[in-house]
Amino acid sequence: MNAPVKPSKLIKGATGDWEVVIGLEIHAQVSSNAKLFSGAATAFGGDQNTHVSLVDAAMPGMLPVINEECVRQAIRSGLGLNAKIHLRSVFDRKNYFYPDLPQGYQISQYKSPIVGEGEVVVDLPDGDSITVGIERLHLEQDAGKLLHDQHPTSTFVDLNRSGVALMEIVSKPDLRSSEQAKAYVSKLRTIMRYLGTCDGDMEKGSLRADVNVSVRRPGEPYGTRCEIKNVNSIRFIGQAIEYEARRQIGILEDGGTIDQETRLFDANKGETRSMRSKEEAHDYRYFPDPDLLPLEFTQAYVDDLKAGLPELPDAKKERFVHDFGLSVEDAGVLVSERESAEFYEAVLAQLKDQGRDGKLAANWVINELFGRLNKDGQSIDASPVSAAQLAAIVELIGEGTISGKIAKELFEIVWTEGGDPRTLVEQRGMKQVTDLSAIEKVVDDIVAANPDKVAQVVAKPAMLGWFVGQVMKSSGGKANPQAVNDLLKRKLGL
């Protein structure tokens, strides 16, 4: 159970505080080369109606055949969500009419889903964490796509997406703010990307959310919920929740009642609008699909899949903190995307002394590399600085060959020109000066030239930093800062 909502999370209305209650249904496209019940391709971006089998087009007499890879991916996702795997599940027909649904029904799972209850720990931006319950995960077919812009008076249907396998992941109503909802979706996306069960590409529609929102006075029973369909970005999920909560509060404070309905989010206006009244389960007339046998597998089959799971983000974060002394925040940043965690681990693999340089490597990946990638609008996969090059820079700092200031200059050279960092340091004379006699002359000159500052630093030792800065400036950043600091203290009698 989650802790009571903090007062700061409550929404202030004209007549008092309100609590928003949120549950999410995430539709995640299964990473598979073929559709759920046919051999048609699932690749995004093909010409219209080119990835359509006779099964997908619902031609008479065509029978569905289950794709085992989709079943495996659903089980692996369930295991990644710490959920119960049902060894027997059933496919049902969900009956409704829509032009992009050629069968006149959707093959889904109703009473007996493949995955039961689970939970996900979600870290929040404010440093807190919450546990969000998972109600179920089931497999179902995606529908086709209506095209309204191809003809002035007609709508066309593209069935490329029809029959593509989806995992619908239903949360419990455990979320209490738009920030929590966004963090939850991000965490689910990260887990599935680590598992390789969904690519999480929201721009291509691989991950979509139906957002259920209701409001109530703190401590009162749940209010009437509205469902906002097919929200396709994490930012829009937050905006839709904020608007919908305010809309419902406004109605209730004016003495009205909330209609249970399905709504759409208009991203251009930042508001939701009514689509239709919300259906109940009986409206869909679910019944077991007579063309498909129940799915049955053994516990040994599930155990084999569990044994083959990769290290997931929570475990990886804990290892980074324990083994390399990273802060929880830094470890969280590194594991938030599979690619960034893999890059950091590739840097670690190149280090001779991971205990000494592991934390420094994390700082460089997060601050220097990520900062520059964001500035240039590049992904980590296209980084001009490789893991091996970054590891070499980190080692040069760790062993005292170059200073932090020189390391940033070296990073810039490697970013723009390439090359081996150690060779560049030798060729360009970038080594840190550790010869005390060479540093001592610079120190003596600066002390002699600033008698007024010497008098001040004796009275106010914090001013020592000014002298260190002057020495570093005179040496072009090559002097060893610690050696400079120690030498100045001795010269000034501090």
Swiss-Prot record:
GO terms for molecular function: asparaginyl-tRNA synthase (glutamine-hydrolyzing) activity; ATP binding; glutaminyl-tRNA synthase (glutamine-hydrolyzing) activity. Its EC number is 6.3.5.-. SMART domains: GatB_Yqey. The keyword Secreted does not apply. It is an enzyme of class 6 (ligase). InterPro entries: Asn/Gln-tRNA_amidoTrfase_suB/E (IPR017959), Asn/Gln-tRNA_Trfase_suB/E_cat (IPR006075), Asn/Gln_amidotransferase (IPR018027), Asn/Gln_tRNA_amidoTrase-B-like (IPR003789), GatB (IPR004413), GatB_C_1 (IPR042114), GatB_Yqey_C_2 (IPR023168), Gln-tRNA_amidoTrfase_suB_CS (IPR017958). It catalyses: L-glutamyl-tRNA(Gln) + L-glutamine + ATP + H2O = L-glutaminyl-tRNA(Gln) + L-glutamate + ADP + phosphate + H(+); L-aspartyl-tRNA(Asn) + L-glutamine + ATP + H2O = L-asparaginyl-tRNA(Asn) + L-glutamate + ADP + phosphate + 2 H(+). Allows the formation of correctly charged Asn-tRNA(Asn) or Gln-tRNA(Gln) through the transamidation of misacylated Asp-tRNA(Asn) or Glu-tRNA(Gln) in organisms which lack either or both of asparaginyl-tRNA or glutaminyl-tRNA synthetases. The reaction takes place in the presence of glutamine and ATP through an activated phospho-Asp-tRNA(Asn) or phospho-Glu-tRNA(Gln). Belongs to the GatB/GatE family. GatB subfamily. Heterotrimer of A, B and C subunits. This is Aspartyl/glutamyl-tRNA(Asn/Gln) amidotransferase subunit B. It comes from Rhodopseudomonas palustris (strain ATCC BAA-98 / CGA009). The lineage of its organism: Bacteria, Pseudomonadati, Pseudomonadota, Alphaproteobacteria, Hyphomicrobiales.
